[in-house]
């Protein structure tokens, strides 16, 4: 499958394996990847990843590991053992944590992509101030994205508004995975920094994470095809 055809990652906003599989029944694994987050993975464990892989979907395991270097690296390698396409950590865990993860993945000859979360898309300046960072979100994103690149990871999660800045700052050989994507007319839900799929791709995003607009659609396949057409 060409990477360019798999720019959409469908977030499986489901509590059970049954519900997740019902969603993917209506999706085409040649047109998208899927994301398994904390709620679904905590309910169902590794079996849901295996079931999705049996349906030929590549899985982004979105667990945002954040711990001491050795513990985080062990968790990342455990995810890689599941054969997931991508896994992530929190960049705020620091350089040593991220470098240790990269070293362990290389030592194990894993092909799993490793990216980092910079600033959660639900956080604005006041939220950062509450945790002792008197800084605009975009400045913290830039700082953590540079650290992620220097640590040898494959990319970062960032909002579309930051994608253009990061592309200029870091260069082309770096994935920018963008949540907070909503097609025209969609509800913003709990994402503060949102943008349309077309604009996100124009701004430099390589992968778009889209959940409820697809999974809650009357016809998820048609919604996915509509989004793909909008960014073609």
UniProtKB/Swiss-Prot annotation:
Record: residues binding substrate: 13, 35, 62-71, 121, 182, 191, 211-212
UniProt keyword terms in alphabetical order: Decarboxylase, Lyase, Pyrimidine biosynthesis
Entry EC number(s): 4.1.1.23
Enzyme class: lyase
Record has Disulfide bond as a keyword: no
A Pfam family of this chain: OMPdecase
GO biological process, alphabetically ordered: 'de novo' pyrimidine nucleobase biosynthetic process; 'de novo' UMP biosynthetic process
Keyword Hydrolase: no
Any one GO cellular component localisation term in the record: cytosol
PROSITE patterns: OMPDECASE (PS00156)
Gene Ontology terms, MF aspect: orotidine-5'-phosphate decarboxylase activity
Known catalytic reactions: orotidine 5'-phosphate + H(+) = UMP + CO2
Function text: Catalyzes the decarboxylation of orotidine 5'-monophosphate (OMP) to uridine 5'-monophosphate (UMP).
Family: Belongs to the OMP decarboxylase family. Type 1 subfamily.
Protein known as: Orotidine 5'-phosphate decarboxylase
Natural source organism: Acinetobacter baumannii (strain AB0057)
């Amino acid at each position: 499958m060409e990477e360019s055809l798999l720019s959409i990652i469908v977030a499986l906003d489901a509590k059970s394996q049954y519900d997740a599989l019902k969603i993917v029944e209506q999706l085409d694994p040649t047109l998208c990847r899927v994301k398994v987050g904390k709620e679904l993975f905590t309910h169902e464990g590794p079996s849901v990843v295996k079931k999705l892989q049996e349906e030929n979907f590549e899985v982004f395991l979105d667990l945002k590991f954040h711990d001491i270097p050795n513990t985080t690296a062990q968790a990342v390698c455990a995810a890689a053992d599941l054969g997931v396409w991508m896994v992530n950590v929190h960049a705020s865990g620091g350089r040593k944590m991220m470098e240790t993860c990269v070293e362990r993945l290389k030592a194990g000859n894993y092909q799993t992509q490793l990216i980092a979360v910079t600033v959660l898309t639900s956080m604005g300046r006041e939220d950062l101030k509450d945790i002792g960072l008197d800084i605009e979100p975009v400045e913290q994103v830039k700082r953590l994205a540079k650290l992620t690149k220097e640590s040898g990871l494959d990319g970062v999660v960032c909002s579309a508004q930051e994608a253009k800045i990061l592309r200029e700052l870091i260069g082309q050989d770096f994935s920018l995975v963008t949540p907070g994507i909503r097609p025209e007319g969609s509800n913003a839900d709990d994402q503060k920094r949102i943008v349309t799929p077309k604009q996100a791709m124009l701004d430099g995003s390589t992968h778009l994470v889209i959940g409820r607009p697809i999974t809650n659609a009357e016809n998820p396949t048609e919604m996915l095809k509509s989004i793909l057409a909008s960014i073609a």
